[in-house]
């Protein structure tokens, strides 16, 4: 709805408020994570970077569900699944243009997390992808970058699924499986920190 950096700033201010009010809210500071799907996955990735850079209380995890972190879209899934699978590559390019109307935004790692020099020091990551999604390789490549930068990260790709299946809990059993898998992974991460 609003171009960069409005959504990023809103998310960061919200996270900062939660951290500052954790005692009043009876929240365990060691269990705060960030997550989102699609554009929300981009924001979650960017918030993880910004929280690290601004030395906010360390986040416990980042949940990235088919994130859009690479504006170039120069990868195989963007051409293989460009049309006919829900989200199209053409639509994705249009969304990027709306979010980043100024050229200087396109080189900012808080807008395009794949451009971050390194991801070291960001929280453990759970990266989710759908098989038939223009963004499958985006998620896969970001996971590889996390691992290369020594960030604990798991990658799960759901065969036969399309972008947006996270929101199909009453429609497909794979969405229910995804919810269970996410809970299992978050519990494993939080269990390691106790």
Task: Say what each PLM segment does.
Residues 1-194:
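Alpha/beta-hydrolase superfamily serine-hydrolase fold, recognizing
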């Amino acid at each position: 709805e609003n171009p960069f950096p409005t959504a990023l700033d809103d998310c960061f201010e919200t996270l900062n408020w939660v951290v500052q009010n954790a005692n009043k809210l009876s929240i365990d500071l060691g269990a705060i994570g960030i997550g989102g799907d699609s554009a929300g996955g981009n924001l979650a990735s960017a918030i993880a970077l910004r929280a690290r850079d601004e030395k906010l209380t360390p986040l416990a995890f980042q949940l990235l569900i088919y994130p859009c972190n690479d504006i170039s879209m120069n990868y195989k899934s963007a051409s293989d699944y460009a049309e006919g699978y829900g989200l199209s590559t053409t639509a994705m390019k249009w969304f990027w243009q709306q979010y980043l109307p100024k050229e200087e935004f396109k080189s900012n790692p808080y807008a395009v997390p794949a451009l971050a020099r390194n991801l070291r020091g960001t929280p453990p990551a759970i990266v989710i992808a759908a098989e038939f999604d223009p963004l499958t390789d985006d998620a896969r490549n970001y996971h590889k970058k996390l691992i290369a930068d020594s960030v604990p990260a798991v990658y799960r790709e759901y065969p036969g699924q399309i972008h947006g299946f996270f929101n199909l809990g009453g429609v497909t059993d794979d969405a229910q499986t995804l919810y269970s898998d996410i809970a299992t992974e978050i519990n494993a991460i939080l269990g390691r920190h106790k």
